[in-house]
Amino acid sequence: MIIKVCGMRDADNIRAVSALGVDMIGLIFWPQSPRYVRMINSRSGIIPDKAGEGVVDDGLARPKLVGVFVDEMPQNIVTRVYNYTLDYVQLHGHESPTMIDNLRRTLDPDIRPGIKIIKAVSVGCADDVERCRDYEGCV
């Protein structure tokens, strides 16, 4: 069984959940979410809000970090993967197989070797399940 806790933002919460031995922690990078992990402005541009940096660096096995994105521009995904050292990218929008394939080629091996990509697909009928076949080989 794999346990993923999603929507984490607070450093103390991340520490506590990590101590429980969860496998993955999800960081929401969708601005419309109340659990959105924001980037903060600096004079040199946009940098990640690293207030919680190192919160899971206590000698224990670190949970894998999953970045959750909805219809985000690929360059913003690449920036977040790099800045947050994400292990997984989870896509919840209308991302095409071509976009996902291009994203993977950009990230692996140069920026984040071995990164995993998850594509969430809403299923309401049998045709939606068939649509999943379009993503074979790119996720």
What residue ranges belong to the model's regions?
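Conserved N-terminal beta1-alpha1 strand-loop-helix module at the mouth
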Residues: 1-139
